[in-house]
Swiss-Prot record:
It comes from Escherichia coli (strain K12). Its cofactor is heme. This is Cytochrome bd-II ubiquinol oxidase subunit 1. GO terms for molecular function: cytochrome bo3 ubiquinol oxidase activity; electron transfer activity; heme binding; metal ion binding; oxidoreductase activity, acting on diphenols and related substances as donors, oxygen as acceptor. GO terms for biological process: aerobic electron transport chain. Inhibited by cyanide; is more sensitive to cyanide than cytochrome bd-I oxidase. Residues 1-22, 115-129, 208-219, 413-470 are cytoplasmic. GO terms for cellular component: cytochrome complex; membrane; plasma membrane.
Length: 514
């Protein structure tokens, strides 16, 4: 039976998964629209303006529904995760506020000018508007991923003994968090791949049916060039992201790789394995020697810690965390004797582990060896979902690289419409970016468990005092509403894609010159 924590996690996870069906396409499409319109302004060829307007209509559908699905996410921090909001709100809220004030308003203002400014702006002004929408979309992703990156690697903050919550000490450390920076570029690049694949798939559909040949060939060419560069960048930055994870989240990396034991350097990479959580081992594993050590440490002599070793390392932190937790209870009840405060300051870095232990030890004054053992096992995520979601992401990314390279070669040869198998391959590859992105998001968030904020706040302690009935009702409502949004997206996209660019010829604007 699911409890409040499970239902809260499911609600946020499903909300984010639905929302992230729309976000990557927004990031990718708007950048491609800016490129198409730039070609129009530079060359004066109106076909590129027509392409911008046609793909822009599909972008508008996706943008509107993406905004709608994102609204409830920020509210859930207050409704479902109130302790989280109180405990780290001063830090976590800063990048979200910057996103709203700087990025979202910029994006929202200029997206209206993009759609309704064709007859009111000259082509140079409209091009500037399009690039500003693209800049705003990417800036929005930057601030949101700064917030998420801080959850993975909390820098520039400390526990304030007066307010009994986390406070920011350095805004620059939050902004330039190395995990955030790598996550931002990796995620945005994945969005570019999504936009490119979307345009290529629909263009391939037109070419297979002998429709909209001029627009489809040019769109496919732009998509294949842009998409190839983007998928190469995505895979390269994925390697950088994994390296950062190895440095700051070794438990997540070990779960991603099904690494139970610390093996001699350089560690092998498990291509496939069957992790068994209860036995703390893999039932079987197919390995590539040395590859994991090279990827995770960029060396041949550094070991990759295994989950058993990492669990053992949590024991002293749980002990110190227990003492910090007990001292915090004294301080919160008014005991601020200098020796108490001094003792707490020496232990506050492990307070999160005390919160984690409290889930397994109702009486923190008397913690048994079995309770410590349960907390140690609870300090790692379920390995199989993390292990397989990582491989789904990498597998889809590798297939996308192959598709993009084949499409690019045939495009450069000028024979793309002569090879129907390439067009069919592009069409049937349309779901791959979304599968990769959703699997990657799941791996990133689920692999951080049991932490809401890595090593600082367990998910167990972050929730609100709601009932299961309240959460079940709101979960059903959100899933139902978001499913309707998704159906609307698919219907409208299919409708206007089937109509094609030629259906818009009668409504072409006369753009101001100058």
């Amino acid at each position: 039976m699911w409890d409040v924590i499970d239902l809260s996690r499911w609600q946020f996870a499903l909300t984010a998964l639905y929302h992230f069906l729309f976000v990557p396409l927004t990031l990718g499409l708007i950048f491609l629209l800016a490129i198409m319109e730039t070609i129009y302004v530079v060359t004066g060829k109106t076909i590129y303006r027509d392409m911008t307007r046609f793909w822009g209509k599909l972008f508008g559908i996706n943008f509107a529904l993406g905004v709608a699905t994102g609204l409830t996410m920020e509210f859930q921090f207050g409704t479902n995760w109130s302790f989280y909001s109180n405990y780290v709100g001063d830090i976590f809220g800063a990048p979200l506020a910057m996103e709203a004030l700087m990025a979202f308003f910029l994006e929202s203002t200029f997206v209206g000018l993009f759609f309704f400014g064709w007859q009111r702006l000259n082509k140079y002004q409209h091009l500037l508007v399009t690039w500003l929408v693209a800049f705003g979309s990417n800036l929005s992703a930057l601030w949101i991923l700064n917030a998420n990156g801080w959850m993975q690697y909390p820098t520039g903050a400390h526990f304030d003994i007066d307010t009994l919550r986390m406070e920011m000490t350095s805004f620059s450390e939050l902004v330039f968090n190395p995990v955030s920076q790598v996550k931002f570029v990796h995620t945005v690049m994945a969005g570019y791949v999504t936009g490119a694949m979307f345009i290529m798939a629909i263009s391939a559909w037109y070419l297979l049916r002998g429709r909209e040949r001029n627009v489809a060939l040019r769109s496919f060419a732009i998509g294949s060039v842009f998409g190839t560069l983007a998928i190469i960048g995505t895979l390269q930055l994925g390697d950088s992201s994994a390296y950062e994870v190895a440095q700051v989240q070794p438990v997540k990396l070990a779960a991603m790789e099904g690494e139970w034991q610390t093996e001699p350097a350089p560690a092998p990479f498990h291509v496939v394995a069957w992790p068994e959580q209860d036995q703390e081992r893999n039932a079987f594993a197919l390995k590539i020697p040395a590859l994991l050590g090279i990827l995770a440490t960029h060396s041949l002599d550094k070991p990759v810690p295994g989950l058993k070793n990492l669990m053992a390392e949590t024991y002293p932190r749980l002990q110190r965390g227990r003492m910090a937790w007990l001292l915090m209870q004294e301080i919160s009840q008014g005991n601020r004797e200098p020796h108490v405060l001094q003792a707490f300051r020496g232990l506050e870095g492990d307070l999160g582990y005390g919160m984690l232990l409290s889930r397994y030890a109702p009486d923190m004054n008397h913690v048994t060896a079995a309770q410590y053992q349960a907390a140690m096992r609870g300090a790692i995520p379920q390995v199989a979902p993390v292990f397989w979601s990582f491989r789904i992401m990498v597998g889809c990314g590798s297939l996308l690289l192959l598709v993009m390279l084949i499409a690019l070669v045939q495009t450069l040869r000028g024979k793309i419409d002569q090879h129907r198998w390439v067009l069919k391959m592009a069409l049937w590859s349309l779901p791959l970016p979304w599968i990769a992105i959703e699997a990657g998001w799941f791996m990133t968030e689920f692999g951080r468990q049991p932490w809401a904020i890595q090593d600082i706040l367990p998910t167990y302690s972050a929730h609100s005092a709601l009932t299961t009935g309240q959460l079940a009702f709101s979960l059903i409502m959100i899933v139902g509403l978001y499913t309707l949004f998704l159906i609307a997206e698919v219907y409208l996209m299919q409708k206007y894609a089937r109509l094609g660019p030629s259906a818009m010829q009668s409504e072409q604007p006369t753009q101001q010159q100058g």
